[in-house]
Amino acid sequence: MQEALNQKIDAFVAANKEQILKDIATLVSINSVEGAPEEGAPYGAGPRAALDKTLELAAGMGLATRNCENHIGYAELAGADAEKYLATICHVDVVPEGNGWTEDPFKMEIRDGWMIGRGVADDKGPMVATLYALKFLKEEGVSLRYPIRALVGDNEETHMHDVDYYLANYPAPVFCFTPDAEFPVCNGEKGHFDGKLVSPVCNGVIKDFVGGVATNAVPDRASALVATDITKLRNAPNITLEPEGDGVRIRGWGKSGHAAMPEGTVNAIGLVVNYLLDNGLCNDAERAYLEAVKKLHDSTAGVGLGIDCADGPFGPLTIIGGKMSMVDGRMVQTMDSRYPTCTDGDTIAKQIRAAIGTGAELTDVGSAKPFYIEADTPAIKACIDTYNEVTGENATPSTRGGGTYARHFPYAVSFGPEHSDMVLPEFGGPMHGANEAAPIDKLLEALKIYIIALLRLEEIDF
């Protein structure tokens, strides 16, 4: 029976491959970065357009759809149970495109078996895969015990207010998985801490300081405008100098990446901070602030701020500075930390305040606790067993730093489709980075995994 099912799925995937890629390209073409709220578009026009188009694609597959008051939506297959249902959840909003792209970020390109475009990995590609999983079940006429909803989020990258709205107004699924992470199964996520380091009004040498496009992304470029003579400045690696007005624009060039996975990135804001300090381009108040910010950028493990720690399930804490801006004469540096169970938001805030002293003010603090679900529960076993059977691996559930929708649900995990050992091609970049890339074959394999996993979840007594 399993062999026959595998053959049916393989045939379905092969027959639908080209349309799957077209549908992903359609969603990628929509710039769905969060925007200003509008009537009927609480997260901006772009996310609303992506939500509408996704539901349109689902309806074209013969799936029932619902727009939940423009906050979120879903495609659904009916089942016998009138109260309990299973769900997947992906999101069609994206982080800002940022800089460094060699192609149009909103025009999907295919090169050597890879998709390139903003959202191909995070999370428009996986969104389309879940719709096709439901399409397969519908076309095969599978009689479902539990209805299955493919939830379509559009505020994941910023606040996740979409899923908060859904859970406040609709019953929660008995189990949910989100294809917004890595295989095999992620049954725990680090805590999340964020805040801002704000300077006093300095009225000094630094006239402007900007960098980054999102709090949860390592910036690949940043710049500061300083009142000085360019002939007095020296060259430095990854720094360029340009005359601008009566001063000099100092630009830092780094390497972008996701805040939860900062290994291998180079923070451009940190490069500029170091250059300003090394060359004395600051008055006393500015120096005190830059010294505080330098402690943030000295280590993505939080060593400079005295918040570094690690535990068994989650590993080490990470922290990055995502955006720098000037607001009403004050420099404002955002930060994003993912922390394990050996600390908490209050402790992190206290330690940061002790580290920065009077040089900066820590404001706008927010945190969410880590979550963890035991790996031996039936639903998680169904997911991990399916993954291992399809791939031939012997993987076990793991935890991660990135925060997903899973932490909002009573019983949920993240489930692919990325692979931690995936090697990006030279022309490809990571999630949240330039030239975001995803391998076509792995996404199609994930589709097969999702179909089989959903069938197995249908057999569980929830």
Question: What residues fall within each predicted segment?
Answer:
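Zn-dependent metallopeptidase/amidohydrolase metal-coordination segment
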Residues: 12, 385-460
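Acidic/His- and Gly-rich active-site-bordering loop/insert found
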Residues: 2-118, 142-144
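Acidic, glycine-rich active-site loops and adjacent beta-strand->loop/helix elements
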Residues: 92-94, 148-159, 179-184, 213, ...
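Short amphipathic alpha-helical face segments that pack within enzyme cores
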Residues: 125-136, 270-274, 445-452
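Midchain, well-structured core segments that form catalytic/ion-binding scaffolds
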Residues: 157, 164-341
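Acidic-glycine-rich active-site phosphate/pyrophosphate-binding loop
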Residues: 95-110, 192-193, 198-199, 242-252, ...
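Substrate-recognition/cap regions that form aromatic- and gly/pro-loop-enriched pockets
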Residues: 326, 331-402
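Active-site metal-coordination/substrate-binding segment of hydrolases
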Residues: 83-152, 158, 170-171, 428-442
